[in-house]
Design a protein with these regions (language model features):
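Hydrophobic ligand-binding cavity/cleft-lining segments
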Residues: 1-55, 184, 188-189
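Charge-dense, helix-prone N-terminal extensions
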Residues: 3-4, 10-11, 63, 80, ...
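Short beta-edge strand/loop motif at the mouth of beta-sheet-based domains
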Residues: 26-27, 33, 37, 44-82, ...
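Hydrophobic/aromatic beta-strand elements that line small-molecule binding cavities or substrate pockets
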Residues: 29, 55, 81-87, 103-110
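Structural motif
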Residues: 21, 88-90, 111-113
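Short, highly charged C-terminal tails/helix-capping segments
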Residues: 147-189
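Beta-strand/loop substructures that line and gate deep hydrophobic ligand-binding cavities in soluble
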Residues: 95-148
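Hydrophobic pocket/interface hotspot
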Residues: 38, 48, 65-67, 85, ...
Length: 189
């Protein structure tokens, strides 16, 4: 079921739709900033590092995207995504297909005194880590809202407790869904 209510900046939970052999994780956020400001935050390397990852971007159709996340796991490993831009309509649409995290899509539309960001990540249906993915994207979109307000993430000391709270909530929703109606292929988790 698509997400329809408006939440300013952060806290809006993501949803999952499963169809055609894929999971589509979707978030919708109202951001009290212009489309141009949000577009810059999702496309310019010096802004991406403040909320998502170190980035190299050839902002052209077919262009290469490389994201290197700055938060590390317990062993110090950092995720790196290599992707190709598959859709580009500045300043409203950016989509790239990557080797990890699937296809990422950022859609912007004007809304009174700001814009709506619809973010989605399309993953193979075999992906069992949906609560992990949802918690990660939820946290990064919260960081985006904060970065647009001038607060960059302190990556060496990033707030894992926030991610953990999101993960526990999504994992609980996933378990409840699995215990509920198994016949539906479409739902919130």
């Amino acid at each position: 079921m698509p997400f329809h209510s408006r939440t300013i900046g952060s806290s809006a939970d993501g949803t999952v739709e499963t169809h055609d052999g894929s999971h589509v994780l979707r978030f919708e956020r109202y951001l009290p900033h212009s489309i141009e400001q949000v577009w810059a935050a999702i496309t310019e390397p010096e802004q991406l590092v403040s909320w998502l990852a170190e980035a190299e971007i050839d902002l052209s159709l077919g262009g290469h995207v490389r994201l290197r996340w700055l938060n590390a796991d317990e062993q110090g490993n950092r995720a790196v995504m290599n992707a190709t831009i598959t859709q580009l309509e500045p300043p409203r649409l950016l989509e790239y297909a990557g080797d990890i995290h699937g296809t990422l899509r950022f859609e912007l539309r004007e809304e009174a005194s700001g814009c709506i960001l619809t973010f989605s990540s399309t993953l193979p249906a075999s992906n069992a880590g949906l609560p992990l993915q949802l918690a990660g994207w939820h946290t990064h979109l919260d960081f985006l809202a904060e970065a647009l307000n001038g607060q960059a993430v302190d990556w060496p000391h990033w707030p894992i407790d926030r991610w953990t709270r999101h993960y526990e909530r999504y994992a609980q929703k996933r378990r409840a869904k699995q215990e509920g109606d198994h016949s539906s292929q479409k739902g919130n988790l």
